[in-house]
């Protein structure tokens, strides 16, 4: 079991190393710690080679659970995760050869459906399935995976997460697990249940302006503006809001419907007047790169996209906000200035 756990850790680390080389910032890796009401002694006593036949399995017991997970975020609403959990895990005994650990490993695949309350705080649910590694090694269990005798354990999680600095993830969730037989009999009483606190890290390059080099395509005098859109940003941020993803998705479909092959996209980033000029110039450029990053990740060639940072030179709120002195009110008033203007040019 120790070799199995170490093998899983090695595979996850290998995946992270390979993914980082591709400079993709949609991946995340994490660990979780918590408590499961899974009676590991009862599970073992029913095994082919039980640890101890004298164990009293009638008394309900729980066990600590430790897990490692790797996930890919397709967008702020949808992710996919693979997870290995070890129930009964004792970190201080794992490398002690003379100690007999009572523990069991399981593999879980799940989709994660999130709803952003704010840019940093999300609530989510996970829908997936879990199998113990012991069952995965038996051909009969694999053949019965979609029958009433299946060892597959469907699960549902409910939780909340907070993301610090756009990189570090903390989350708390409860996972409800039941077997196929109980679900088919419409029983809602779970076979297993885990409460866990998780910590994760989104990796890949965070400075999106380093991902793409600035390139300004040659434009034709006969070009005209086919489409335009404004995308707004939170204060002092380059992160896209959930509503911005919806607007960009719609714009992307409209771009693909343009019959002309000679299409160029001009992205003009803007900042509000709070802060010094140099900082706002860089912030406006990074916002434009954020939109460029979205378009290129959805199949639009970066050669067709040009960006420019306008700093805080072209405010939309000069007259409206000139007499506002209270900082929170001023931040709210200047919201229209924190934007990227998108112009789609076609011949």
Curated annotation (Swiss-Prot):
A single GO BP: monoatomic ion transmembrane transport
SUPFAM superfamilies listed in its UniProt record: OMPA-like, OmpA-like
Disulfide links within the chain: 321-333
Keyword Transmembrane recorded: yes
GO cellular component assignments: cell outer membrane; pore complex
UniProt keywords, alphabetically: Cell outer membrane, Disulfide bond, Ion transport, Membrane, Porin, Signal, Transmembrane, Transmembrane beta strand, Transport
Molecular function per GO: porin activity
Residue ranges of the TM segments: 26-36, 63-74, 78-86, 105-116, 121-129, 154-163, 168-175, 194-202
Signal peptide: 1-21
Compartment list: Cell outer membrane
Gene3D superfamilies from the UniProt entry: 2.40.160.20, OmpA-like domain
Region annotation (Hinge-like) ranges: 207-218
Annotated site residue numbers, Part of salt bridge gating mechanism: 81, 171
Protein name: Outer membrane protein A
Organism the protein comes from: Buchnera aphidicola subsp. Schizaphis graminum (strain Sg)
């Amino acid at each position: 079991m120790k070799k199995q756990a170490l093998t899983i850790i090695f595979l996850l680390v290998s995946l992270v190393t390979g993914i980082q080389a591709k400079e993709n910032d949609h991946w995340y890796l994490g660990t979780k710690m918590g408590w499961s009401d899974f009676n590991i002694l009862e599970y073992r006593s029913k095994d082919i080679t039980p640890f101890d036949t004298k164990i009293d399995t009638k008394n309900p017991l729980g066990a600590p659970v430790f897990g490692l997970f790797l996930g890919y975020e397709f967008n702020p609403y949808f992710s996919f995760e693979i997870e290995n959990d070890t129930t009964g895990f004792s970190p201080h005994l794992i490398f002690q050869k003379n100690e007999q650990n009572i523990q069991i490993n399981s593999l879980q695949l799940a989709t994660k459906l999130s709803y952003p309350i704010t840019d940093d705080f999300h609530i989510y649910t996970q829908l997936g399935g879990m199998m113990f590694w012991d069952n995965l090694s038996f051909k009969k269990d694999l053949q019965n995976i979609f029958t009433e005798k299946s060892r597959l354990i469907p699960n549902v999680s409910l939780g909340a997460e907070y993301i610090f600095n756009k990189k570090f993830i903390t989350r708390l969730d409860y996972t409800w697990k039941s077997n196929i037989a109980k679900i088919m009999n419409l029983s809602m009483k779970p076979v297993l249940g885990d409460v866990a606190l998780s910590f994760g890290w989104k990796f890949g390059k965070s400075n999106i302006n380093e991902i793409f080099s600035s390139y300004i395509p040659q434009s034709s005098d006969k070009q005209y503006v086919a489409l335009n859109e404004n995308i707004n940003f939170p204060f002092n941020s380059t992160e896209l809001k959930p509503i911005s993803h919806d607007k960009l998705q719609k714009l992307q479909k409209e771009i693909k419907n343009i019959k002309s092959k000679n299409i160029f996209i001009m992205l003009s980033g803007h900042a509000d007047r709070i802060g010094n000029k140099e900082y706002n110039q860089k912030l406006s450029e990074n916002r434009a790169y954020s939109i460029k990053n979205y378009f290129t990740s959805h199949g639009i060639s970066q050669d067709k996209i040009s960006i420019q940072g306008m700093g805080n030179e072209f405010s939309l709120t000069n007259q409206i906000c000139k007499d506002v002195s209270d900082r929170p009110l001023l931040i709210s008033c200047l919201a229209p200035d924190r934007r990227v203007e998108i112009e789609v040019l076609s011949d």
